[in-house]
């Protein structure tokens, strides 16, 4: 489990990105880069790093499921992920 402060920070960053998304899009399209530069640093989506929705773990993130590989494996073995089954060939 990640530190609670990191998880809270990530949620705050996601909210900032969402809040400034439209303004950022219009400023970029109009080429008003000086005003774009004055926006909060954390409002750019490139600063976000994907984290597991359940544990907050930043590494081993599976984008399709929104969770880390470890938590994915646990839930898949328990049969709690619909449509996921163990592969065999």
Swiss-Prot record:
Q: Name one GO biological process term.
A: translation
Which Pfam families does its entry note?
Ribosomal_S14
Record bears the keyword Ribosomal protein = yes
Keyword check for Cell membrane, yes or no. Answer: no
Annotated Gene Ontology cellular component terms = cytoplasm; small ribosomal subunit
Instruction: Give the GO molecular function terms.
Output: rRNA binding; structural constituent of ribosome
Which superkingdom is the protein from? Answer: Bacteria
Q: Which UniProt keywords apply?
A: Ribonucleoprotein, Ribosomal protein, RNA-binding, rRNA-binding
Tell me the NCBIfam families matching this sequence.
Answer: PRK08881.1
Family annotation (PANTHER family):
30S RIBOSOMAL PROTEIN S14, SMALL RIBOSOMAL SUBUNIT PROTEIN US14M
Q: How does it assemble?
A: Part of the 30S ribosomal subunit. Contacts proteins S3 and S10.
Q: What does this protein do?
A: Binds 16S rRNA, required for the assembly of 30S particles and may also be responsible for determining the conformation of the 16S rRNA at the A site.
Family stated for the protein in its record? Belongs to the universal ribosomal protein uS14 family.
Name this protein carries in UniProt: Small ribosomal subunit protein uS14A
Q: What is the lineage of its organism?
A: Bacteria, Bacillati, Bacillota, Bacilli, Bacillales
């Amino acid at each position: 489990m990640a530190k609670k402060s990191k998880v809270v920070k990530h949620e705050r960053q996601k909210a900032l990105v969402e809040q400034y998304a439209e303004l950022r899009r219009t400023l970029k399209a109009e080429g008003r880069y000086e005003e774009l530069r004055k926006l909060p640093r954390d409002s750019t989506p490139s600063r976000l790093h994907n984290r597991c929705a359940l544990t907050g773990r930043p590494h081993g993130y599976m984008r399709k499921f929104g969770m880390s590989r470890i938590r994915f494996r646990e839930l898949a073995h328990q049969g709690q992920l619909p449509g996921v089954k163990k592969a065999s060939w």
